[in-house]
A protein has these predicted regions:
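ATP/NTP phosphate-donor binding region
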Residues: 1-86, 319-320
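ATP/nucleoside-binding phosphotransfer catalytic cores, i.e., glycine-rich phosphate-binding loops
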Residues: 2-7, 12-17, 203-205, 210, ...
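Glycine-rich beta-strand-to-loop/alpha-helix junction loops that act as flexible
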Residues: 35, 89-91, 114
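Catalytic core of DAGKc-family lipid kinases
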Residues: 32, 42, 54-55, 65, ...
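Gly/Ser/Thr-rich active-site loops/lids in small-molecule metabolic enzymes
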Residues: 175-183, 218, 226, 232-253
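Glycine-rich phosphate/pyrophosphate-binding beta-alpha loops
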Residues: 160, 164, 217-230, 294
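Short glycine/serine/threonine-rich phosphate/pyrophosphate-binding segments
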Residues: 71, 93-98, 119
Length: 320
């Protein structure tokens, strides 16, 4: 009787040991957060913590951006710590900085959008509400995306030189918080009289194509603020950059160009091309931007592409 009891106890101990060994390890995420983008930071932290706890995730690693680190080094730190997922919560600039930190690591990026543009989220069909975005980030599928680089700075949405950078740089921050993407429209109106600049475009090392241009936009995805589909054929995982060359001046010229884009008309005001590498040489220094962040002025914009180097968490079944 004693032997049978001992044997039973030993058997139960072995079963418990196997269960512990076979149990799935507790997952942990890092949250890179731009505190200035949140009106209720404590409420945000509580909502994220509860969502993770409800799904059996460990308490997240919290990392706040600073003026000297908008997210890239923080995301790298998170990857080195061994997390299973990096969540980025902020505007497009924060998302792009985190992309730079996790690209090529094999650790997926989850997006918790809270900025004005939210262009990556909108182009990938990601939800904008926190609860839904958390559900996708914690239970969705991973999609492998291309990452571009403009003058060495990574982007996943778009980079550009000329008019779009002027528009982005001129948008008032307080107005953006009140009226959203319409602030960019108001900024654009102030630059309609700018005359096109002579530019030379060299795609994939080919001969230069010289033309007058107000701006050149290079995209990994197709939609701008307001869901304007500037690059209708752009796909973020096809290994190809889509390019739009814009040429207009004055109210009338830009109205015609806007109509061309909305109606997808092929005219000299909007020219499209595709490539894997592009160099733009401008006749004079022009502002340039990456993923909605103005980077300064330059006469040359060199854009390259690294196919499939980024994993992004998307709704289940939407992984390409």
């Amino acid at each position: 009787m004693h032997d049978a009891t001992a044997g039973t106890a030993a058997s139960h101990h072995d079963d418990a040991g196997r269960a512990a060994t076979d149990a799935e390890p507790v997952r942990r995420a890092a949250v890179v957060i731009h505190p200035g983008k949140h009106d209720d930071l404590d409420g945000f932290r509580a909502a994220v913590g509860k969502a993770m706890s409800d799904l059996g995730w460990a308490e997240p690693l919290w990392l706040e951006t600073r003026p000297d680190d908008t997210g890239e080094r923080l995301a790298q730190e998170a990857v080195r710590s061994g997390v299973d997922l990096v969540l980025a919560s902020g505007g497009d600039g924060t998302i792009t900085a985190c992309v730079s930190g996790v690209a090529g690591s094999g650790v997926p990026l989850g997006v918790l959008p809270c900025g004005t543009g939210n262009l990556l989220a909108r182009n990938l069909g990601l939800p904008l509400s926190l609860d839904e975005a958390l559900a996708v980030a914690l239970t969705g599928s991973d999609r492998r995306l291309d990452v571009g680089a403009a003058n060495g700075r990574p982007f996943v949405v778009m980079a550009g030189i000329g008019f779009d950078a002027e528009m982005l740089g001129g948008a008032d921050e307080r107005l953006k918080s009140r009226v959203g993407w319409a602030a960019y429209v108001l900024s654009a109106l102030r630059h309609l009289r700018e005359r096109p600049v002579r530019m030379a475009l060299r795609a994939d090392g080919g001969p230069p194509q010289r033309r007058w241009a107000s701006g050149v936009i290079v995209g990994n995805v197709g939609s701008l603020q307001g869901n304007v589909r500037l690059l209708p054929d752009a796909v973020p995982d096809d290994g190809i950059l889509d390019v739009a060359v814009l040429a207009a001046s004055g109210w009338t010229g830009w109205l015609w160009l806007a109509a061309d884009v909305l109606l997808r008309r092929k005219t000299g005001r909007v020219a499209h091309l595709t490539c894997r590498e592009l160099t733009v040489q401008a006749g004079r220094a022009r502002p340039w931007e990456v993923d909605g962040e103005v980077a300064g002025t330059t006469r040359q914009l060199r854009v390259t592409l690294e196919p499939g180097c980024l994993l992004v968490r998307v709704p289940a079944g939407n992984d390409g």
